[in-house]
Design a protein with these regions (language model features):
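C-terminal region/appendage detector
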Residues: 1-407
Protein backbone atom coordinates (compact mmCIF):
# COMPACT_ATOMS: atom_id res chain seq x y z
CA UNK A 1 0.00 0.00 0.00
CA UNK A 2 3.03 2.28 0.01
CA UNK A 3 1.92 3.46 -3.43
CA UNK A 4 4.14 2.04 -6.15
CA UNK A 5 5.59 4.04 -9.04
CA UNK A 6 3.73 6.19 -11.58
CA UNK A 7 5.56 8.10 -14.34
CA UNK A 8 8.89 7.52 -12.62
CA UNK A 9 7.59 8.95 -9.33
CA UNK A 10 6.85 6.99 -6.18
CA UNK A 11 3.32 7.73 -5.01
CA UNK A 12 2.45 7.49 -1.32
CA UNK A 13 -0.67 5.90 0.06
CA UNK A 14 -3.23 8.17 1.70
CA UNK A 15 -4.55 7.69 5.22
CA UNK A 16 -8.10 8.81 6.08
CA UNK A 17 -9.37 8.82 9.66
CA UNK A 18 -12.92 10.04 10.25
CA UNK A 19 -14.32 11.05 13.63
CA UNK A 20 -17.30 13.02 14.90
CA UNK A 21 -15.07 16.01 15.56
CA UNK A 22 -12.93 16.04 12.42
CA UNK A 23 -11.75 14.29 9.26
CA UNK A 24 -7.97 13.68 9.28
CA UNK A 25 -6.20 13.04 5.99
CA UNK A 26 -2.57 12.82 4.93
CA UNK A 27 0.25 10.73 3.50
CA UNK A 28 1.49 7.40 4.82
CA UNK A 29 4.83 7.67 6.57
CA UNK A 30 4.21 11.18 7.89
CA UNK A 31 4.13 11.98 11.62
CA UNK A 32 0.77 13.77 11.55
CA UNK A 33 -2.07 14.36 9.08
CA UNK A 34 -1.69 16.98 6.39
CA UNK A 35 -5.18 18.28 7.09
CA UNK A 36 -7.69 18.16 9.94
CA UNK A 37 -11.11 19.32 8.71
CA UNK A 38 -14.28 19.64 10.84
CA UNK A 39 -16.72 16.80 10.17
CA UNK A 40 -19.51 19.35 10.06
CA UNK A 41 -20.52 20.68 6.66
CA UNK A 42 -22.49 23.86 6.11
CA UNK A 43 -25.06 24.18 3.35
CA UNK A 44 -27.32 26.91 2.03
CA UNK A 45 -30.31 26.41 -0.24
CA UNK A 46 -30.29 29.31 -2.67
CA UNK A 47 -31.67 30.35 -6.03
CA UNK A 48 -29.20 31.58 -8.63
CA UNK A 49 -29.21 32.55 -12.28
CA UNK A 50 -26.96 31.16 -14.98
CA UNK A 51 -24.58 34.15 -14.83
CA UNK A 52 -23.83 33.78 -11.13
CA UNK A 53 -20.28 32.66 -10.36
CA UNK A 54 -19.13 31.21 -7.06
CA UNK A 55 -16.19 33.04 -5.50
CA UNK A 56 -16.19 31.51 -2.03
CA UNK A 57 -13.13 29.22 -1.85
CA UNK A 58 -14.70 27.30 1.03
CA UNK A 59 -17.90 26.49 -0.87
CA UNK A 60 -18.94 24.04 -3.57
CA UNK A 61 -22.06 24.22 -5.72
CA UNK A 62 -24.32 21.41 -6.82
CA UNK A 63 -27.78 21.34 -8.34
CA UNK A 64 -29.65 23.11 -11.13
CA UNK A 65 -29.21 26.67 -12.32
CA UNK A 66 -32.56 27.67 -10.82
CA UNK A 67 -31.93 26.31 -7.34
CA UNK A 68 -28.88 24.78 -5.77
CA UNK A 69 -27.39 23.76 -2.48
CA UNK A 70 -24.12 25.51 -1.69
CA UNK A 71 -21.73 23.59 0.57
CA UNK A 72 -19.30 25.24 2.96
CA UNK A 73 -16.29 23.45 4.43
CA UNK A 74 -13.38 24.07 6.83
CA UNK A 75 -13.20 25.98 10.10
CA UNK A 76 -13.11 29.55 8.68
CA UNK A 77 -16.03 28.76 6.37
CA UNK A 78 -18.40 27.19 8.87
CA UNK A 79 -17.57 29.72 11.62
CA UNK A 80 -18.47 32.70 9.42
CA UNK A 81 -22.04 33.87 10.10
CA UNK A 82 -24.17 33.32 6.99
CA UNK A 83 -27.91 33.64 6.51
CA UNK A 84 -29.78 30.30 6.34
CA UNK A 85 -26.64 28.15 6.67
CA UNK A 86 -27.43 24.80 8.28
CA UNK A 87 -24.70 22.56 9.72
CA UNK A 88 -24.83 18.79 9.29
CA UNK A 89 -22.51 15.85 9.82
CA UNK A 90 -22.29 12.71 7.71
CA UNK A 91 -21.73 10.47 10.77
CA UNK A 92 -24.00 8.75 13.26
CA UNK A 93 -22.64 6.60 16.10
CA UNK A 94 -19.21 6.69 14.48
CA UNK A 95 -20.48 5.30 11.17
CA UNK A 96 -21.17 7.02 7.86
CA UNK A 97 -24.88 7.82 7.72
CA UNK A 98 -25.23 10.51 5.03
CA UNK A 99 -23.44 9.28 1.92
CA UNK A 100 -24.10 12.39 -0.17
CA UNK A 101 -22.39 14.58 2.43
CA UNK A 102 -19.56 12.08 2.77
CA UNK A 103 -18.99 12.24 -0.97
CA UNK A 104 -18.93 16.05 -0.87
CA UNK A 105 -16.36 15.93 1.92
CA UNK A 106 -14.12 13.53 0.00
CA UNK A 107 -14.37 15.73 -3.10
CA UNK A 108 -13.30 18.70 -1.00
CA UNK A 109 -10.41 16.84 0.69
CA UNK A 110 -8.99 15.63 -2.62
CA UNK A 111 -9.39 18.95 -4.45
CA UNK A 112 -8.63 21.59 -1.83
CA UNK A 113 -6.43 19.95 0.79
CA UNK A 114 -4.51 17.14 -0.89
CA UNK A 115 -4.62 18.62 -4.41
CA UNK A 116 -3.97 15.34 -6.20
CA UNK A 117 -5.48 12.73 -8.48
CA UNK A 118 -7.29 10.11 -6.42
CA UNK A 119 -6.63 7.42 -9.06
CA UNK A 120 -2.89 7.52 -8.35
CA UNK A 121 -2.95 6.86 -4.59
CA UNK A 122 -4.02 3.80 -2.58
CA UNK A 123 -6.11 4.59 0.51
CA UNK A 124 -6.14 3.23 4.06
CA UNK A 125 -9.42 4.19 5.73
CA UNK A 126 -10.22 3.80 9.44
CA UNK A 127 -13.63 2.59 10.61
CA UNK A 128 -15.51 2.22 13.88
CA UNK A 129 -15.08 -1.27 15.42
CA UNK A 130 -18.86 -1.76 15.26
CA UNK A 131 -19.22 -0.66 11.64
CA UNK A 132 -21.74 -2.71 9.67
CA UNK A 133 -20.92 -4.92 6.69
CA UNK A 134 -23.29 -2.98 4.41
CA UNK A 135 -21.58 0.34 5.20
CA UNK A 136 -18.15 -1.18 4.63
CA UNK A 137 -19.24 -2.46 1.22
CA UNK A 138 -20.76 0.89 0.28
CA UNK A 139 -17.59 2.80 1.19
CA UNK A 140 -15.49 0.32 -0.77
CA UNK A 141 -17.77 0.74 -3.77
CA UNK A 142 -17.59 4.54 -3.54
CA UNK A 143 -13.79 4.64 -3.35
CA UNK A 144 -13.27 2.29 -6.29
CA UNK A 145 -16.08 3.41 -8.60
CA UNK A 146 -16.01 7.18 -8.13
CA UNK A 147 -12.42 7.88 -7.09
CA UNK A 148 -10.82 5.01 -9.06
CA UNK A 149 -8.25 4.33 -6.35
CA UNK A 150 -5.77 1.51 -7.13
CA UNK A 151 -6.04 -0.20 -3.70
CA UNK A 152 -8.15 0.13 -0.57
CA UNK A 153 -7.72 -1.10 3.00
CA UNK A 154 -10.42 -0.62 5.64
CA UNK A 155 -9.27 -1.21 9.22
CA UNK A 156 -10.73 -0.65 12.66
CA UNK A 157 -9.52 2.49 14.40
CA UNK A 158 -8.87 0.69 17.70
CA UNK A 159 -6.31 -1.55 15.97
CA UNK A 160 -4.64 1.52 14.49
CA UNK A 161 -4.46 3.20 17.91
CA UNK A 162 -2.81 0.09 19.30
CA UNK A 163 -0.28 0.04 16.45
CA UNK A 164 0.46 3.74 16.96
CA UNK A 165 1.51 2.92 20.51
CA UNK A 166 3.60 -0.10 19.59
CA UNK A 167 1.07 -2.70 20.71
CA UNK A 168 -0.71 -5.52 18.91
CA UNK A 169 -2.61 -6.57 22.05
CA UNK A 170 -4.36 -4.40 24.62
CA UNK A 171 -7.55 -2.53 25.47
CA UNK A 172 -8.10 0.74 23.61
CA UNK A 173 -10.05 3.29 25.64
CA UNK A 174 -11.18 5.87 23.10
CA UNK A 175 -13.09 8.83 24.54
CA UNK A 176 -14.00 11.18 21.73
CA UNK A 177 -16.72 13.70 21.01
CA UNK A 178 -19.74 11.44 20.63
CA UNK A 179 -19.01 8.41 22.80
CA UNK A 180 -16.43 6.47 24.79
CA UNK A 181 -15.57 2.88 23.95
CA UNK A 182 -13.34 0.17 25.36
CA UNK A 183 -12.20 -2.14 22.57
CA UNK A 184 -10.01 -5.18 23.26
CA UNK A 185 -7.44 -5.96 20.57
CA UNK A 186 -5.61 -9.30 20.43
CA UNK A 187 -2.78 -9.88 17.94
CA UNK A 188 -4.11 -7.05 15.76
CA UNK A 189 -7.74 -8.20 15.74
CA UNK A 190 -10.70 -6.67 17.57
CA UNK A 191 -12.63 -8.95 19.95
CA UNK A 192 -16.08 -7.90 18.73
CA UNK A 193 -18.20 -9.46 21.48
CA UNK A 194 -16.21 -7.62 24.18
CA UNK A 195 -16.67 -4.04 22.92
CA UNK A 196 -18.23 -1.81 25.59
CA UNK A 197 -19.61 1.66 24.81
CA UNK A 198 -20.69 4.60 26.95
CA UNK A 199 -22.34 7.94 26.06
CA UNK A 200 -20.10 9.70 28.58
CA UNK A 201 -17.78 11.59 26.24
CA UNK A 202 -16.97 15.07 24.97
CA UNK A 203 -20.52 16.12 24.07
CA UNK A 204 -21.76 14.89 27.44
CA UNK A 205 -19.29 17.12 29.30
CA UNK A 206 -20.11 20.04 27.02
CA UNK A 207 -23.80 19.63 27.89
CA UNK A 208 -22.90 19.42 31.59
CA UNK A 209 -21.12 22.77 31.23
CA UNK A 210 -24.13 24.28 29.46
CA UNK A 211 -26.45 23.05 32.23
CA UNK A 212 -24.10 24.46 34.88
CA UNK A 213 -24.20 27.95 33.35
CA UNK A 214 -27.99 27.81 33.01
CA UNK A 215 -28.27 27.02 36.72
CA UNK A 216 -25.93 29.93 37.52
CA UNK A 217 -27.91 32.28 35.21
CA UNK A 218 -24.77 33.02 33.21
CA UNK A 219 -25.63 34.03 29.66
CA UNK A 220 -23.38 32.49 27.01
CA UNK A 221 -22.49 35.06 24.36
CA UNK A 222 -20.39 33.70 21.45
CA UNK A 223 -17.60 35.70 19.81
CA UNK A 224 -19.52 36.48 16.62
CA UNK A 225 -22.04 38.64 18.51
CA UNK A 226 -19.50 40.93 20.18
CA UNK A 227 -18.31 44.22 18.69
CA UNK A 228 -16.56 45.51 21.84
CA UNK A 229 -16.42 44.88 25.58
CA UNK A 230 -15.36 46.65 28.75
CA UNK A 231 -13.28 45.26 31.57
CA UNK A 232 -15.37 44.42 34.64
CA UNK A 233 -14.62 43.06 38.09
CA UNK A 234 -15.07 39.40 38.93
CA UNK A 235 -18.71 38.21 38.78
CA UNK A 236 -19.97 41.67 37.77
CA UNK A 237 -22.41 41.83 34.84
CA UNK A 238 -20.67 42.04 31.49
CA UNK A 239 -20.65 45.33 29.58
CA UNK A 240 -20.44 44.74 25.86
CA UNK A 241 -21.80 45.99 22.55
CA UNK A 242 -23.40 43.76 19.96
CA UNK A 243 -22.17 43.73 16.39
CA UNK A 244 -24.44 45.62 14.03
CA UNK A 245 -23.62 43.62 10.90
CA UNK A 246 -24.74 40.16 12.01
CA UNK A 247 -26.65 38.52 9.12
CA UNK A 248 -30.35 37.82 9.49
CA UNK A 249 -31.81 34.31 9.61
CA UNK A 250 -28.93 32.57 11.38
CA UNK A 251 -29.99 28.95 11.87
CA UNK A 252 -30.31 27.17 15.21
CA UNK A 253 -27.77 24.53 14.14
CA UNK A 254 -25.15 27.21 13.46
CA UNK A 255 -25.83 29.20 16.64
CA UNK A 256 -25.69 26.01 18.73
CA UNK A 257 -22.36 25.14 17.10
CA UNK A 258 -20.87 28.52 18.03
CA UNK A 259 -22.02 28.18 21.64
CA UNK A 260 -20.58 24.66 21.69
CA UNK A 261 -17.21 25.98 20.49
CA UNK A 262 -17.26 28.45 23.36
CA UNK A 263 -18.07 25.71 25.87
CA UNK A 264 -15.26 23.53 24.54
CA UNK A 265 -12.81 26.37 25.15
CA UNK A 266 -14.08 26.63 28.72
CA UNK A 267 -13.80 22.87 29.15
CA UNK A 268 -10.17 22.80 28.00
CA UNK A 269 -9.13 25.80 30.07
CA UNK A 270 -10.99 25.32 33.35
CA UNK A 271 -12.06 21.73 34.02
CA UNK A 272 -10.02 19.17 35.92
CA UNK A 273 -10.70 15.61 37.05
CA UNK A 274 -9.86 15.01 40.70
CA UNK A 275 -7.38 12.34 41.80
CA UNK A 276 -10.09 10.57 43.79
CA UNK A 277 -13.87 10.65 44.27
CA UNK A 278 -15.23 14.19 44.52
CA UNK A 279 -15.05 15.74 47.97
CA UNK A 280 -16.28 19.33 48.16
CA UNK A 281 -14.02 20.32 51.07
CA UNK A 282 -10.90 18.99 49.36
CA UNK A 283 -11.91 20.52 46.03
CA UNK A 284 -12.45 23.93 47.68
CA UNK A 285 -8.88 23.82 49.02
CA UNK A 286 -7.43 23.33 45.53
CA UNK A 287 -6.16 26.33 43.51
CA UNK A 288 -8.94 28.19 41.72
CA UNK A 289 -9.00 28.95 38.00
CA UNK A 290 -9.88 32.40 36.68
CA UNK A 291 -11.85 32.32 33.44
CA UNK A 292 -13.06 35.18 31.25
CA UNK A 293 -15.88 34.77 28.74
CA UNK A 294 -15.85 36.39 25.29
CA UNK A 295 -18.16 39.22 26.46
CA UNK A 296 -15.88 40.14 29.37
CA UNK A 297 -17.75 38.41 32.20
CA UNK A 298 -15.20 36.65 34.42
CA UNK A 299 -15.27 34.37 37.43
CA UNK A 300 -13.13 32.18 39.68
CA UNK A 301 -13.91 28.46 39.72
CA UNK A 302 -12.97 26.21 42.63
CA UNK A 303 -14.86 23.00 43.43
CA UNK A 304 -17.23 23.28 40.46
CA UNK A 305 -14.42 22.75 37.97
CA UNK A 306 -13.84 19.33 39.56
CA UNK A 307 -17.52 18.48 39.97
CA UNK A 308 -18.50 18.88 36.29
CA UNK A 309 -16.15 16.17 34.85
CA UNK A 310 -16.54 13.92 37.91
CA UNK A 311 -19.52 12.26 36.20
CA UNK A 312 -17.11 10.60 33.74
CA UNK A 313 -15.87 8.41 36.59
CA UNK A 314 -18.67 8.53 39.17
CA UNK A 315 -21.96 8.21 37.32
CA UNK A 316 -23.99 8.84 40.48
CA UNK A 317 -23.12 12.52 39.94
CA UNK A 318 -25.31 12.57 36.82
CA UNK A 319 -28.73 14.10 37.34
CA UNK A 320 -31.40 11.57 36.41
CA UNK A 321 -28.76 8.84 36.82
CA UNK A 322 -29.25 5.77 34.67
CA UNK A 323 -27.77 2.74 36.43
CA UNK A 324 -26.82 1.11 33.11
CA UNK A 325 -24.35 3.90 32.26
CA UNK A 326 -20.77 3.00 33.14
CA UNK A 327 -17.87 5.28 33.98
CA UNK A 328 -14.41 5.18 32.42
CA UNK A 329 -12.76 2.54 34.60
CA UNK A 330 -15.90 0.39 34.58
CA UNK A 331 -16.04 0.07 30.81
CA UNK A 332 -12.38 -1.01 30.73
CA UNK A 333 -12.89 -3.75 33.31
CA UNK A 334 -16.22 -4.80 31.76
CA UNK A 335 -14.60 -5.13 28.34
CA UNK A 336 -11.80 -7.31 29.70
CA UNK A 337 -14.33 -9.43 31.59
CA UNK A 338 -16.20 -10.19 28.36
CA UNK A 339 -13.09 -11.66 26.71
CA UNK A 340 -12.19 -15.34 26.72
CA UNK A 341 -10.22 -16.47 29.77
CA UNK A 342 -7.25 -17.45 27.58
CA UNK A 343 -6.54 -13.86 26.51
CA UNK A 344 -7.92 -11.97 29.50
CA UNK A 345 -4.65 -11.81 31.41
CA UNK A 346 -2.77 -10.25 28.47
CA UNK A 347 -4.99 -7.16 28.29
CA UNK A 348 -4.66 -5.14 31.55
CA UNK A 349 -0.95 -4.51 30.95
CA UNK A 350 -1.73 -2.40 27.87
CA UNK A 351 -4.65 -0.01 28.38
CA UNK A 352 -4.19 2.46 25.51
CA UNK A 353 -5.76 5.86 26.14
CA UNK A 354 -6.80 7.93 23.13
CA UNK A 355 -9.36 10.51 22.02
CA UNK A 356 -9.75 14.25 22.53
CA UNK A 357 -11.92 13.93 25.65
CA UNK A 358 -9.03 12.25 27.52
CA UNK A 359 -7.14 15.57 27.30
CA UNK A 360 -9.18 17.00 30.20
CA UNK A 361 -6.68 17.76 32.96
CA UNK A 362 -6.31 14.86 35.39
CA UNK A 363 -8.19 12.32 33.23
CA UNK A 364 -5.42 9.74 32.90
CA UNK A 365 -4.28 10.09 36.53
CA UNK A 366 -7.81 9.40 37.79
CA UNK A 367 -8.28 6.49 35.40
CA UNK A 368 -5.04 4.92 36.60
CA UNK A 369 -6.02 5.37 40.25
CA UNK A 370 -9.50 3.89 39.76
CA UNK A 371 -8.18 0.88 37.85
CA UNK A 372 -5.53 0.11 40.49
CA UNK A 373 -7.70 0.68 43.58
CA UNK A 374 -11.06 -0.71 42.45
CA UNK A 375 -9.90 -3.96 40.87
CA UNK A 376 -8.26 -7.12 42.28
CA UNK A 377 -4.52 -6.87 42.95
CA UNK A 378 -3.96 -9.77 40.55
CA UNK A 379 -5.01 -7.51 37.66
CA UNK A 380 -1.96 -5.32 37.10
CA UNK A 381 -3.10 -2.41 34.97
CA UNK A 382 -0.72 -0.27 32.97
CA UNK A 383 -1.83 2.76 31.00
CA UNK A 384 -0.21 3.42 27.63
CA UNK A 385 -0.50 7.17 27.12
CA UNK A 386 0.93 8.96 24.05
CA UNK A 387 3.53 11.58 24.95
CA UNK A 388 1.78 14.56 23.38
CA UNK A 389 -1.80 15.75 23.00
CA UNK A 390 -1.39 15.60 19.20
CA UNK A 391 -0.45 11.91 19.37
CA UNK A 392 -3.42 11.19 21.62
CA UNK A 393 -5.88 12.98 19.32
CA UNK A 394 -4.44 11.47 16.15
CA UNK A 395 -3.60 7.95 17.36
CA UNK A 396 -5.71 6.11 14.74
CA UNK A 397 -4.30 8.26 11.93
CA UNK A 398 -0.71 7.79 13.13
CA UNK A 399 -1.24 4.03 13.36
CA UNK A 400 -2.62 4.06 9.83
CA UNK A 401 0.36 6.08 8.63
CA UNK A 402 2.76 3.52 10.11
CA UNK A 403 0.85 0.52 8.75
CA UNK A 404 0.30 1.90 5.24
CA UNK A 405 3.99 2.80 4.89
CA UNK A 406 4.99 -0.80 5.68
CA UNK A 407 2.55 -2.73 3.50
Amino acid sequence: MSGGVYGGEELCALVFDVGHNSFRAGFAGEDCPKTDVPSLIGYIEEAIDSKTEQTDINANNVGSQQSQRRYIFDTPGIKSPRSNMELLTFLKDGMIDNWDLMEKMLDHIYAKHLNLESAHHPVLFSEAPWNSRSKREKLCELMFEKYNIPAFFLIKNAVLSAFANGRATGVVLDSGQNQTSAVPVHDGFVIQQAIVQSPLAGDFITNQCRQYFEEKNIKLVPYYMIASKEQVKESEPARWKERSNIPDNLTSSWKNYMVKEMLQDFKAAALQVGDSAFNKEIAESMPSIHYEFPNGYNMDLTSDRFLIPEALFDTSQIKGFNSTVMGMSQIVTASIGLCDVEIRTSLPGSVIVTGGNTLINGFTERLNRDLTTKTPASMRYKLIIPNSSIERRYSPWIGGSILASLV
